[in-house]
């Protein structure tokens, strides 16, 4: 069995690829990360006292209810209701590999310590990941500015709420049953800010993008071999290579960011301050996904030209579908949350299109 530690700073695409490929791999929280989380969690507990200042997301409502103060004695009960209004979704479920990877990525985000959650929560998430209990998450319903809907559905499985569902050993089950069969506690009590800290980020988008990119890397050598002529690649491939390298850098960086709002920063004289900087945004991944979809359309053109015979018709069909994925998504923006979230980048849609386009490119390469 291979054991990997996450610390919020060093989770790379290559590491995710190794963990995903190794069915016996296990992931744990590093001691250093655990200590950081305990320090910031102590500050959250202090803000739950009656004479504490008003801190968004800790003792207030969310979104356009940001100015509504929630008394400490009501907060735990209110906290339990948070996933429900956000966990709306439509469409088929995302692939289990996506939601599993989102658990790993979210645990790494929280391990940085800036969100103020207990280490026990991160350990709970990792135990679910290690047991391969994949939350059932609808594929429609996120703008990419914080994957609130998809991540709220993750939260419901982590907490073991009655309405949640999950995949376990190929079967779709109520989450509590899946957790029990995996040898885990059926429920887990989420404390102050721990629902928000799990929902408030674009981690489902990141998971889709990461898995699609890893799959693309698996196809890359085959694409190069098909496109080469006399050992030389076409000139346009160098431009593709630039975008591929840029995207890998973006995804590696985004694996290890503090994707939450607010974040806790240590003060020079001790204690922490809560900083509201909308760090739930994922604009850069949306841009990278749009560029990669353009790259795939270009590569698919080349693969199509190398395909002959009876397969030509199938190749044209696949090429057309890949090209439709190259239509830009992240240039759009429609305000949400009563106008409180006034810029959304739809990176979730861009990442899903990339995931699909990679799948189509694999089929085209196989012709």
Please state what every model-predicted region is.
Residues 87, 91-95, 99-224:
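Active-site cavity-forming subdomains of large catalytic enzyme subunits
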Residues 199-207, 267-276, 338-346:
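Short, charged/polar, low-complexity loop and linker segments
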């Amino acid at each position: 069995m291979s054991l990997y530690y996450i610390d919020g700073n060093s989770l790379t695409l290559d590491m995710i690829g190794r963990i995903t490929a190794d069915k016996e791999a296990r992931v744990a929280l590093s001691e250093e990360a655990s200590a950081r989380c305990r320090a910031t969690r102590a500050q959250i507990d202090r803000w739950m006292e009656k004479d504490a200042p008003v801190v968004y997301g800790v003792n207030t409502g969310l979104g356009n209810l940001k100015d509504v103060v929630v008394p400490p004695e009501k907060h735990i009960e209110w906290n339990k209701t948070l996933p429900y209004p956000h966990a709306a979704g439509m469409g088929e479920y995302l692939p289990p590999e996506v939601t599993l990877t989102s658990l790993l990525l979210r645990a790494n985000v929280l391990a940085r310590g800036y969100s103020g959650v207990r280490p026990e929560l991160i350990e709970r998430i990792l135990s679910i990941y290690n047991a391969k209990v994949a939350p059932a998450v609808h594929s429609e319903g996120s703008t990419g500015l914080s994957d609130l809907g998809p991540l709220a559905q993750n939260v419901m499985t982590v907490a073991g709420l009655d309405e949640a569902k999950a995949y376990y050993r190929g079967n779709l089950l109520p989450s509590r049953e899946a957790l029990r069969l995996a040898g885990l506690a059926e429920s887990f009590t989420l404390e102050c800010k721990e629902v928000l800290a799990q929902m408030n980020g674009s981690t489902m988008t990141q998971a889709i993008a990461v898995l699609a990119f890893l799959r693309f890397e698996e196809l890359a050598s085959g694409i190069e071999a098909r496109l080469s002529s006399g050992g030389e690649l076409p000139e346009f491939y160098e431009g593709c290579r630039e975008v591929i390298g840029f995207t890998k850098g973006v995804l590696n960086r985004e694996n290890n960011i503090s994707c939450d709002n607010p974040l806790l920063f240590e003060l020079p004289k001790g204690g922490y301050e809560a900083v509201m900087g909308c760090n739930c945004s994922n604009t850069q991944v949306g841009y990278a996904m749009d560029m990669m979809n353009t790259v795939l359309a270009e590569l698919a053109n080349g693969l199509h030209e190398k395909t002959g015979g009876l397969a030509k018709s199938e190749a044209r069909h696949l090429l057309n579908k890949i090209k439709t994925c190259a239509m830009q998504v992240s240039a759009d923006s429609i305000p949400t949350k009563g106008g409180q979230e006034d810029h959304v980048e739809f990176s979730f849609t861009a990442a899903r299109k990339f995931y699909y386009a990679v799948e189509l490119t694999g089929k085209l390469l196989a012709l």
